[in-house]
Design a protein with these regions (language model features):
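Gly/Pro-rich, tryptophan- and cysteine-flecked surface segments typical
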Residues: 1-200
Length: 200
């Protein structure tokens, strides 16, 4: 059983359940709610969850993988962001703690040079910060690189960036705990053919 506010959905053993327009389902709404939030999915059994953010104009989907409570940390690295050409970056930072705190957000170039910084941004208990156009909101453009988010005051955080275009295409980059790097990693798939290429 998966519990949501006022909702309980049964997922078959080894199966999958898709909930279309989940925001409307949770609020018993028949039309657009205008709500922005993060979702918590809780279950009696171990689960994996993902969401597809679908552009209502182009029907273009972007996949977003869930993060567990254990993914929270005090320093998070979002591997990529961009404000160059047609690409923009939205950023969301979630406070997983039941008390308020602050975060400092830093963007660095590929050479490690600081190119943007937001100091001591307040974030409520179990709340979130959302920047629809992170760099545009700072008056910056023509840059790209990783984003670091540092939690202050003992809170645990997660962060995700979405690189997107006004035409509707987009992709998610989920933050990782900076302290959990590895000396060897595996990329599950790489392709180089007439239809696709792989950048690393």
């Amino acid at each position: 059983e998966i519990a949501a506010p006022g909702k309980q959905i049964t997922v078959p053993a080894y199966g999958m359940t898709q909930i279309n327009n989940v925001g409307r389902v949770l609020e018993d709404a028949s039309s657009i709610t205008g709500r922005e939030a993060y979702l918590i999915v809780e279950s009696e059994q171990e689960i994996r969850a993902w969401a597809s953010q679908i552009d209502n104009l182009t029907e273009d989907p972007s996949m977003e993988r869930s993060q567990s409570d254990a993914d929270g940390s005090q320093r998070v690295l979002v591997p990529s962001s961009a404000a160059i050409g047609q690409f923009l970056t939205s950023l969301i930072v979630i406070n997983q703690s039941d008390f308020a705190g602050q975060v400092t957000i830093r963007s660095r170039s590929n050479a490690g040079v600081l190119q943007a910084e937001l100091l001591n941004q307040s974030i409520e208990a179990n709340g979130f910060l959302h920047f629809a156009d992170f760099y545009g909101g700072l008056g910056l453009s023509n840059l790209y690189g990783p984003i670091e988010v540092e939690a202050l005051g003992g809170i645990q955080i997660t962060a995700t960036a979405r690189i997107y275009t006004q035409e509707g295409s987009s992709g998610y980059f989920q933050g990782v705990d900076i302290s959990k790097g590895s000396k060897k990693v595996v990329m599950p798939f790489s392709v180089d053919n007439d239809d696709f290429r792989t950048n690393l």
